[in-house]
Design a protein with these regions (language model features):
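Cytochrome P450 core scaffold surrounding the K-helix E-X-X-R motif
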Residues: 6-9
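C-terminal hydrophobic helical "lid"/dimerization subdomain
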Residues: 162, 254-305
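NAD(P)H dinucleotide-binding glycine-rich loop of Rossmann-like/cofactor-binding domains
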Residues: 56-136
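Structural detector of well-ordered beta-strand residues that form the stable sheet scaffold
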Residues: 29, 49, 97, 134, ...
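Glycine-rich beta-strand-centered segment in the early N-terminal region that forms part
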Residues: 1, 12-61, 100-102
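Short, flexible surface segments
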Residues: 41-44, 129, 212
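Mid-domain Rossmann-like dinucleotide-binding core that forms the NAD(H)/NADP(H) cofactor-binding site
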Residues: 48, 101-183
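Glycine-rich cofactor phosphate-binding loops and adjacent beta1-alpha1 units
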Residues: 125, 152, 165-245
Length: 305
């Protein structure tokens, strides 16, 4: 099961579970152990994935439009229902995904959320090939977005803003055109920016570097309240005028997950992962909170625990 910052949000209470205790984890890879009577999509032993979206009502206007991520009855894995930091999990068959043979379990896990929400964020930028893209932060999601963007928009320069020299070097290794510290000025105005950090300051710092008509997409379920006073620095003329847009990402759809898995196979995308035993889950979440010593995504190996 992949480890995600949203797991930390659930554990620390920024995302409220309806009941506690709850088992976190929503980037699950496993084998089908038992099938309900009405299921015909899978067989016992099939390798499947389970993502953040655990179910939706299927009848509201959002579900009918293929946007079940906005369903008022949206239920999330590892929050509304128990998740993947466990030996077994239960999921509706319609919200499970066949995992392609070209990916290991550990590689496939982060694609289910870090990859899928990154894919959705990239689509929401409405970037066209040749336009300049910025990525703020360079963790599990951003390192996948960079690779997806290079494939989808091969002529687009990609600028990465990251805190540590190691993260910036990692971004350059994966093909970033330019790297700088968070808050640095890029060499050119950016047509789109995807923010993957938990804080507000990087967004406020980045907005003046957004070109006229540019889009900034916030790739996060929640933002920290620690630095929310940074929003008081917003100046309409320098941060928002000239039809700049700020857009949030709300969850993912099933189609986002399917497209991400298909794209990974098409371009040979193999997430950089660190595999840890379940007993290290708390230490892994602490590392995620501090954002120190991370390269790519962390994945818990439940079977070896």
């Amino acid at each position: 099961c992949g480890i995600c910052r949203t797991d930390l949000d659930v554990v620390e209470g920024r995302v409220k579970a309806p009941t506690y205790p709850v088992i976190p984890g929503h980037q699950i890879i496993g084998r089908v152990a038992r099938i309900g009577g009405k299921s015909s999509d899978f067989r016992d032993g099939d390798r499947v994935g389970v993502a953040w979206i655990n179910s939706a009502d299927g009848v509201c206007r959002w579900c009918r439009a293929g946007m079940e991520n906005l369903c008022p009855q949206f239920r999330s894995t590892g929050c509304d229902v128990d998740g993947g930091y466990a030996e077994y999990a239960v999921v509706p068959a319609a919200f499970a995904y066949s995992i392609p043979d070209g990916l290991t379990d550990a590689e496939a896990a982060p694609l289910l959320c870090a990859g899928a929400i990154g894919w959705r964020s990239l689509r929401l930028t409405r970037l066209t090939d040749g336009e300049r893209l910025g990525l703020i932060g360079f963790g599990a999601s951003a390192h996948l977005v960079l690779q997806l963007a290079r494939h989808r928009y091969p002529s687009s320069p990609i600028h990465v803003f990251a805190r540590s020299p190691a993260e910036r070097a990692f971004a350059r290794d994966l093909g970033a055109t330019w790297t700088g510290e968070i808050g640095d000025a890029p060499p050119d105005q950016l047509d789109a920016i995807i923010d993957t950090t938990p804080a507000w300051k990087p967004i406020v710092d980045a907005l003046p570097h957004l070109a006229a008509g540019g889009r900034l997409v916030i790739n996060a379920i929640r933002k920290s309240s620690v630095d929310k006073n940074e929003l008081l620095r917003l100046d309409y003329a320098s941060h928002l005028w000239m039809e700049r847009e700020i857009k949030s990402v709300a969850n993912v759809t099933r189609e986002d997950v399917k497209q991400t898995l298909a794209a990974a196979i098409e371009i040979g995308l193999h997430p950089t992962v660190e595999i840890l035993p379940l007993r290290d889950a708390n230490r892994a979440l602490a590392r995620l909170s501090n954002a120190k010593g991370l390269r790519g995504a962390m994945v818990l190996d439940i079977a070896e625990s």
